[in-house]
Regions:
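Hydrophobic positions on the long internal alpha-helix
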Residues: 90, 126-130, 134, 176-177, ...
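A glycine-rich helix->loop->beta "capping" turn
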Residues: 4-5, 57-58, 78-91, 97-100, ...
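Canonical Rossmann dinucleotide-binding motif of NAD(H)/NADP(H)-dependent dehydrogenases/reductases
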Residues: 2-36
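Conserved glycine-rich Rossmann-like NAD(P)H-binding loop of the short-chain dehydrogenase/reductase
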Residues: 31-47
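The beta1-alpha1 cofactor-binding region of Rossmann-like NAD(H)/NADP(H)-dependent oxidoreductases
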Residues: 42, 62-77
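C-terminal helical subdomain
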Residues: 186-187, 193-194, 201, 205-248
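Catalytic loop of short-chain dehydrogenase/reductase
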Residues: 13, 17, 95-97, 102-116, ...
Length: 248
């Protein structure tokens, strides 16, 4: 049954209670959005959707594997049966790098393919699959969640975990952001990339004490997701402040 909720937002990679995706979903749900949690583990996504519903918010969960084009298309079809428009798309799903690879000379090719499939190709594919619904919204917003790693191309910063494959994938995601923004320049759709900063979403891994909470990190993503008609497009931001374009 189509939703009667006026604003709809889909967040990919939203299946962990301490993850950025769920924090963004809660923020948007509290701003009167019907939030769609899309994740490979739909059971976990449904648990989180139920947690939101128990708080009086509107939420649903769908299965999504960005490495599987059939899964992307299936989500598009199923979502079209529930809603007639999509106001916000948060491309949050991300494959994590192998941090043991510190040089472009020893990158594992399987890991590289996984990183690009999720962080770039899957994001692109999902955006195109949902574009018809995005065009039906009065002024849709697309937010690509990037990383400080995109600004580390070719650098070896002391004390910073460095993965050339991950940096290159996020750098490419930033380039995709600019490309999509240009392609949609004649529409009311705004496309931006947001770096949420270092997020304490994996306490079991010993996150740094200075990492931001998921809720704190989500604020900048929500800012980009709720920009007004005169908002920027094709830019890079953190906490609503512009970041310089990554350079080679």
């Amino acid at each position: 049954m189509p939703t009667t909720h006026s604003r709809v937002a889909l967040i990919s990679g939203a299946s962990r209670p301490l993850g950025l995706g769920f924090a963004v979903a809660r923020h948007l749900a509290e701003r009167d959005h019907h939030v769609i949690l899309a994740a490979r583990n739909v059971a976990q996504g449904e648990e989180l959707a139920e947690a939101l519903r128990s708080d009086g918010l509107v939420a649903s969960a769908f299965a999504l594997d960005l490495a599987d084009q059939a899964s992307v298309q299936r989500l598009s079809v199923e979502l079209s049966g529930m809603v007639d428009h999509l106001d916000v798309l948060i491309n949050n799903a991300s494959a994590m790098p192998d941090f043991t690879s510190r040089s472009a000379l020893d990158v594992d090719m399987d890991s590289l393919h996984t990183l690009f499939q999720t962080n770039v190709f899957g994001c692109w594919s999902l955006t195109l699959a949902l574009l018809p619904l995005l065009r039906q919204a009065p002024a849709a917003r697309i937010v690509n969640v990037t990383s400080a790693a995109a600004w580390q191309i070719g650098k070896r910063t002391p004390g910073l975990l460095f993965s050339p494959a991950y940096s290159l994938a996020k750098f490419t995601l930033n380039a995709l952001t600019v490309t999509l923004a240009a392609a949609l320049a004649d529409s009311p759709i705004l496309v931006n990339a947001v770096d949420p900063g270092s997020v304490a979403s994996h306490p079991e891994r010993g996150d740094d004490k200075d990492d931001r909470s998921p809720s704190e990190a989500a604020a900048g993503v929500v800012w980009a997701a709720t920009l007004g008609a005169d908002g920027p497009t094709g830019g890079f931001f953190q906490d609503g402040a512009p970041l310089p374009a990554p350079t080679l």
